[in-house]
Amino acid sequence: MAPGATATPFLPTVSNETTLRESFVRDEDERPKVAYNVFSSEIPVISLEGIDEIEGRRVEICKKIVAACEDWGVFQVVDHGVDAGVIADMTRLAREFFSLPPEDKLRFDMSGGKKGGFIVSSHLQGEAVQDWREIVTYFSYPIRARDYSRWPDKPEDWRSVTEKYSETLMELACKLLGVLSEAMGLDTEAITKACIDMDQKVVVNFYPKCPQPDLTLGLKRHTDPGTITLLLQDQVGGLQATKDGGKTWITVQPVEGAFVVNLGDHGHFLSNGRFKNADHQAVVNSNTSRLSIATFQNPAPDAIVYPLAIREGEKPVLDEPITFAEMYRRKMSRDLELAKIKKLAKVENQEVLEKTKVEAVAQPKGLGEILA
């Protein structure tokens, strides 16, 4: 390689390797327990038809959404009002982007702290094990914060289609947050007001076929830090959820045209823990690639995080009000520290194992063993 030249990063989309690279291999306790296509019907599918009615269907929809948020923290919505043509265009452009030659995608490489663009992503910066996915991400709200230099210029129409998609998803998210505000006995706009100037980040995930899917994850187990997330996924399957700390997992049944909705940590705290922050991950497979588009609705960095409603007999889940920026910093620091502790424990266990092997070989056999 010429002096000063840099190696092309490994891209799963163009890999023909039959063995998974070590950097993607998860510890046994993190590996998939349920296949990508063993679907569960436990996550409710809720029709939003009539949600704009003052009474009538809105009351019934509200009850279903609240029940889902108290149980799993995740549900699916249909009849949501997002135009099918917008969904089709967004999905088409996403697939076209990941089909581009590596050099076209890498022009928007976001490594080195760049905000937005393309990356082969680990769940957490500094974590040793990578997730088996490629992503392209951009920040769409507030509008003044859009940096179009970090938005792909291929395929054509990316900007116009993604702007329309972002706009309609913002409307849907605010509508759902209105239902949750009312469920807490607050004004319809209470949660969106608590976000101050709501941020929106769109992450387009592409999970290529994987040579050894039983050894890795497309996206490591986590909860989202923000208020609410809306996920559009194809029909392949791979999104999984748990509500018992990872002991058992279910694979969410893909529903054509539906959005999977899950609450994040911020939404969980605003409800004083009443609504669950969904614990989820993504698994991959060796048969076909998978596409999903996650739209994260987050509060402004300076928004205050504290329960909006505390029911009688409850205590606040937070000791004191903090900003979302501080909440996010603490979450990332905690996750990174846990990753470091686990990595250190793994190294120490390996050293103990190697030492035991050496001692076993060096230990002289007794006379009884020799004559046995």
UniProtKB/Swiss-Prot annotation:
Task: Please tell me in which tissues this protein is expressed.
Answer: Expressed in young cromes.
Reactions listed under catalytic activity: a (2S)-flavan-4-one + 2-oxoglutarate + O2 = a (2R,3R)-dihydroflavonol + succinate + CO2; (2S)-naringenin + 2-oxoglutarate + O2 = (2R,3R)-dihydrokaempferol + succinate + CO2; (S)-eriodictyol + 2-oxoglutarate + O2 = (2R,3R)-dihydroquercetin + succinate + CO2
Record EC number: 1.14.11.9
The family database entries (PROSITE patterns) matched by this protein are listed as: FE2OG_OXY
Q: Does the keyword Transport apply?
A: no
Please state the pathway this protein functions in, per its UniProt record.
Flavonoid metabolism
> Which residues are listed for 2-oxoglutarate binding in this entry?
R290
**UniProtKB keywords:** Dioxygenase, Flavonoid biosynthesis, Iron, Metal-binding, Oxidoreductase, Vitamin C
The record's similarity note reads: Belongs to the iron/ascorbate-dependent oxidoreductase family.
Q: What is this protein called?
A: Flavanone 3-dioxygenase F3H1
What is the species listed in this Swiss-Prot or TrEMBL entry?
Crocosmia x crocosmiiflora (Montbretia)
Gene assigned in the entry: F3H-1
